[in-house]
From Swiss-Prot:
One of its GO terms (cellular component) is cytoplasm. Coiled coil: none annotated. One of its GO terms (molecular function) is 3'-5'-RNA exonuclease activity. It is an enzyme of class 3 (hydrolase). Belongs to the oligoribonuclease family. It comes from Pseudoalteromonas atlantica (strain T6c / ATCC BAA-1087). Pfam families: RNase_T. 3'-to-5' exoribonuclease specific for small oligoribonucleotides. This is Oligoribonuclease. Keywords: Cytoplasm, Exonuclease, Hydrolase, Nuclease. The active site is at Y129.
Length: 181
């Protein structure tokens, strides 16, 4: 597959909470699609090592959700740090999209970008400054045409790769039902 500036990079991260000032990244996954949202490749799915102290001090929602999904234990056992995750992810991206070309794509992607700025600035720098945030469409549809939302539901597993797949499927749904494309 050739490098193409029209390809889109989808990233999702799972964190220990919502605040990059105190919380950290537990997992990162990446998918590249073409401009028509066809999946071209799934990148590395990396659990990032965090100490027992960090994992034991997550908020209750994170303890329950990441414990149930197995992510807490994967993070505990992982030998991957943030720098390794960045290097592996960029190595993958370089095969599909040039630096600075793709907006960062995902659901509530501004949150992921905040964590990238703090913990993974080299990765954040790989993206165009724009975002394709599926949650923006969801919020607009909720207000302007809420009946459309009845046709789409997400499992909400809160594992990074599954969340990206759901985000892509959700954008495909909106493309068909809102934009009629």
């Amino acid at each position: 597959m050739a490098v193409d500036a029209q390809n889109l990079v989808w990233i999702d991260m799972e964190m220990t909470g919502l605040h990059p000032e105190v919380d950290v990244v537990l997992e990162i996954a990446t998918i590249v699609t073409d401009a028509n949202l066809n999946i071209l490749a799934e990148g590395p799915v990396l659990a990032i090592h965090q100490s027992d102290d960090v994992l034991n001090n997550m908020n209750q929602w994170c303890i329950d959700t990441h414990g149930k999904s197995g992510l807490t234990e994967r993070s505990r056992k992982s030998t991957v740090d943030e720098q390794t995750a960045v290097a592996e992810t960029i190595r993958f991206l370089e095969k599909y999209v040039p630096k600075g070309a793709s907006p960062l794509c995902g659901n509530t992607i501004g949150q992921d970008r905040r964590f990238m700025v703090k913990y993974m600035p080299e990765l954040e720098d790989y993206f165009h400054y724009r975002n394709i945030d599926v949650s923006t469409l969801k919020e607009l549809v909720k207000r302007w045409k809420p009946e459309v939302l009845e046709g789409f539901s997400k499992k909400g597993v809160h594992l990074a790769l599954d969340d990206i797949r759901e985000s892509i499927a959700e954008l495909v749904f909106y493309r068909q039902h809102i934009f009629n494309i």
